[in-house]
């Protein structure tokens, strides 16, 4: 019987700095599915990365993965590069579906991002796998608590979101298998099994 491989990662001052940076950058943001402070999301993604065997560098990138996309584009990315280095800034760039404002249409952004991830760093793939598992878990919880009206908070609606999840699973699992992808596949099946929203064919809400 083989020994269980334990993650030997330790978190130092740079990780603490990333937490403070993310808290400042996302201070005014809330999660669309729960209203929780947005920092809860990046902390959850970082936790999944570390539990998956990720390095401190990957955990820092997880904490920062939405900073440029949501809060300042290239300007914030340059700040991340200055504070945390080129490698982490590249991971954050590859985790972003756009760095421009106003953002392009939802479907176009997602298609673009899928293309970017085909040649992304291995570290980016781990962060994105953790991000998708976290998002799918929260979506499942929202569907349990609020039912089909949950989809009103998503720009892609039910069909668009499931399309995106399936495409992400196909791409990410091809690059890297393991628990996160098994969990993502399970969550997609669970989400698909929830009843259709009566308003699913209507124009989606723009809050997503």
Label every PLM stretch briefly.
Residues 2-208:
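Active-site helical microenvironments for divalent-metal-assisted chemistry
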């Amino acid at each position: 019987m083989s020994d269980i491989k334990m993650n030997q990662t330790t978190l130092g001052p740079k990780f603490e700095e990333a937490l403070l940076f993310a808290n400042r950058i996302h201070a005014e943001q809330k999660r669309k599915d729960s209203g929780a402070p947005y920092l809860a999301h990046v902390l959850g993604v970082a936790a999944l990365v570390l539990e998956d065997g990720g390095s401190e560098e990957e955990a820092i990138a997880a904490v920062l993965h939405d900073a440029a996309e949501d809060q300042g584009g290239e300007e914030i990315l340059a700040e991340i590069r200055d504070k945390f280095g080129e490698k982490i800034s590249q991971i954050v760039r590859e985790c972003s579906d756009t760095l421009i404002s106003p953002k392009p249409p939802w479907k176009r952004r997602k298609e673009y991002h899928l293309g970017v991830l085909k040649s992304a760093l291995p570290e980016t793939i781990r962060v994105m796998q953790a991000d998708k598992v976290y998002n799918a878990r929260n979506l499942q919880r929202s569907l349990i608590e609020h039912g089909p009206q949950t989809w009103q908070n998503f720009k892609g609606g039910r069909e668009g979101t499931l399309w995106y999840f399936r495409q992400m699973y196909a791409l990410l699992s091809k690059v890297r298998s393991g628990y996160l992808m098994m969990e993502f596949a399970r969550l997609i099946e669970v989400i698909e099994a929830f009843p259709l929203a009566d308003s699913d064919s209507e124009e989606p809400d723009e809050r997503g």
